[in-house]
């Protein structure tokens, strides 16, 4: 499988998490390619039983497609752990590096890397690392955007976005840190959270990319 096709698989998977319907237009926008290029790739992927057309959802990954996506995330996140713990990369540096390496390392390399790292369960951004042969099921899956009540929470996962990671680093907010959800303003569509004795106004776009758990 080519790196380009693997990127399409991940793109379709991620759109399916964010949106109800996966369209050629959305794929083209995220992949930064032309609509005809998307149409051609979609044809190939359908012929290889990686995706199928769905009236309501646009496209769905097949079991084979989901298996391949899970393996890509497994490689990517194990590489991120290695970069942070053994090569002193920072959390906002590792994503782009792992994006390149995930397409080049062998299955044997990944198995030995996982053993070297002590079989980690999550990446530095809090994303779940699926075991070999298992589908990806995120452990930390409650977005801040879905929080309905004020209270004490803990940051458990963030999207692999440079802008988000830079924003969190600027405010010294890291995976595992406690935070207080003080209120939600429906008019401005923002959350007020307290972190490190600082009130932060978090808009809905950011809140969708931060995952938390309630602290009892």
How would you name each of these model-derived features?
Residues 18-26:
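Short acidic, hydrophobic short linear motifs in intrinsically disordered regions
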Residues 29, 46-47:
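Alpha-helical residues within the helix-turn-helix
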Residues 36, 92:
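Key DNA-contact positions within bacterial/archaeal DNA-binding proteins
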Residues 42-43:
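Short, hydrophobic-biased segments on the C-terminal half of alpha helices
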Residues 47-54:
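A short, conserved structural fragment
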Residues 57-76:
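Basic, amphipathic "hinge/linker" alpha-helix immediately C-terminal to the N-terminal HTH DNA-binding motif
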Residues 102-209:
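Mid-protein regulatory/catalytic core that forms ligand/cofactor-binding pockets
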């Amino acid at each position: 499988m080519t790196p380009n096709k693997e990127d399409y698989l991940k793109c379709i998977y991620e759109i399916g998490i964010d949106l109800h319907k996966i369209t050629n237009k959305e794929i083209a926008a995220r992949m930064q390619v032309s609509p005809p290029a998307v149409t051609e790739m979609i044809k190939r992927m359908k012929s290889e039983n990686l995706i199928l057309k769905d009236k309501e959802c646009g496209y769905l990954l097949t079991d084979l497609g989901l298996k391949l996506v899970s393996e890509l995330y497994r490689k990517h996140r194990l590489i991120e752990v290695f970069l942070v713990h053994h090569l002193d990369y920072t959390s906002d540096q590792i994503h782009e590096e792992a994006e390149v390496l995930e397409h080049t390392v062998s299955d044997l390399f990944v198995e030995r890397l996982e053993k070297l790292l002590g079989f980690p369960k999550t990446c530095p951004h809090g994303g779940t690392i699926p075991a070999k042969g298992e589908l990806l099921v995120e452990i930390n899956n409650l977005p801040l955007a879905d929080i309905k009540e004020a209270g004490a929470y803990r940051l458990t996962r963030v999207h692999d976005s440079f802008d988000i990671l830079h924003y969190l680093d600027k405010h010294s907010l890291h995976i595992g840190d406690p935070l207080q959800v003080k209120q939600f303003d429906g008019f401005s569509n923002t959350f007020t959270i307290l972190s490190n004795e600082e009130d932060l106004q978090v808009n809905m776009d950011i809140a969708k990319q931060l995952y938390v758990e309630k602290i009892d």
